[in-house]
Amino acid sequence: MIMSEYRHIELSDPNLERDHLRLLTFGSPALKRRGDVTLFLPPEVETLLNVPLVILLHGVYGSHWSWTFSGGAHLTARKLIAEGRLRPVVIAMPSDGLWGDGSGYVTHASADYEKWIMEDVAGCVTELVPALSARSPLFLSGLSMGGYGALRLGAKYAGRVSGISAHSSVTHLHQLKSFVDDSPDADAICNSADELNVLYWMKLHRETLPPLRFDCGMGDLLIEENRQLHQALNEMQIPHTYQEFPGGHTWEYWQKHLTDTLLFFESIC
């Protein structure tokens, strides 16, 4: 057990870990309770400094293990590193804070799920991993609700984030009603409903927005929302890359196109 400004930190035993995955639980000031993170720590980072930190956000119903044991994110990253196509990176895959079926990664009355990601996860992981520092590039990505989180938080904290990539994204919090009974928009705390729209933050911070890409499957129920975001960004002349591929709102799609995200981040470094 390690004492830290994040209260009690529990890490899995390296002797029992597999596939370069490490499990982390710590007391989060933003959540006011414990939070969970799965880490991918390739062996190459042990001798490196200031390596990139990639935060992958999951969708509704999921948790910190979703990107690994449903999406094989660590296997994709390991393959790309071994092929020399991706430099060694640390990947942090946090839970969304476990509010209802999905917190939306926004501030609620009971807990701040936005600060959980941007302050606690990024801060605690950087504190624990010697290869990371304040100079490490920070990249955000996610799928569905996690795509919304990556787009919104990446745009809101544009000065801190080096790149954004999202898959099959919810583009406004109210769209989660298509997936869950209790949408987090009713519990969200913000100055105006506009702040729950990813486009609001992209427009507000257009001058400092980091490199941005997003994609969606042509058979995805969110395809029209993603096309509308693409069109709106074009009309505002905000640089971005938007791609459509065959596929739906499935792990098969996200497993395949995580490669696009990681190679996009590599191109920025």
Could you say what each language-model-derived stretch is?
Residues 1-269:
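Non-catalytic cap/lid and distal C-terminal segments of serine-dependent acyl enzymes
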